[in-house]
């Protein structure tokens, strides 16, 4: 459960990174595909090389969805309901991949904003990313 301070921390982080959705999203995906190569199986039609237009486009979608969730932090479920349907019913993404993506996103934030990622902010972001993952897997059966 996200506390008031957690919500403030998350909103502050996304306020600072919002203008970098495309770059941070692409970097997050590249890290995930490199570190966890099994995640590539969901993207057989993508050019997975560094700088690929497809990775940049999808990365921007990923971070834009996280920004939307942060902007609607009191209703993450409502903000991501359609994505939950898509990932559970059509794409059938293994739920563990959301955690892997979240870990890679935290690394990207830490690289680009090291002073921002205090232990408290890190914990808040981790809780938020877990909440996002829970929403995205809520419709799995």
UniProtKB/Swiss-Prot annotation:
Binding sites annotated in the UniProt record for O2: 58
| UniProt function note | Involved in oxygen transport from the lung to the various peripheral tissues.
Domain named Globin is located at 1-141
* Classification via Pfam families: Globin
Please state what the protein is called: Hemoglobin subunit alpha-A
| A single GO molecular function term of this UniProt record | peroxidase activity
On subunit structure and binding partners, the annotation says:
Heterotetramer of two alpha chains and two beta chains.
Q: Which residues form a coiled coil?
A: none
Query: Does the entry feature the keyword Repressor, yes or no?
Result: no
Keywords for this protein: Heme, Iron, Metal-binding, Oxygen transport, Transport
Q: Which GO terms describe its biological process?
A: hydrogen peroxide catabolic process
Entry comment describing in which tissues the protein is expressed? Red blood cells.
- Family listed: Belongs to the globin family.
Residues the entry annotates as binding heme b? 87
Q: Write out the GO cellular component annotations.
A: blood microparticle; haptoglobin-hemoglobin complex; hemoglobin complex
Q: Does the keyword Heme apply?
A: yes
């Amino acid at each position: 459960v996200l506390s008031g301070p957690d919500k403030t921390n998350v909103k502050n982080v996304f306020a600072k990174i919002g203008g970098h959705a495309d770059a941070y999203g692409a970097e997050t995906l590249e890290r995930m595909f490199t570190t966890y190569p099994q995640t590539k199986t969901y993207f057989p039609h993508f050019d997975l090389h560094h700088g690929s237009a497809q990775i940049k486009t999808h990365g921007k979608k990923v971070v834009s969805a996280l920004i939307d969730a942060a902007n609607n932090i009191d209703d993450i479920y409502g903000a991501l309901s359609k994505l939950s349907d898509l990932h559970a019913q059509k794409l059938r993404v293994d739920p563990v991949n959301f955690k892997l993506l979240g870990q890679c996103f935290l690394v990207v934030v830490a690289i680009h904003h090291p002073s921002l990622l205090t232990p408290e902010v890190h914990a808040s972001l981790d809780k938020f990313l877990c909440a996002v993952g829970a929403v995205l897997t809520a419709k799995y059966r």
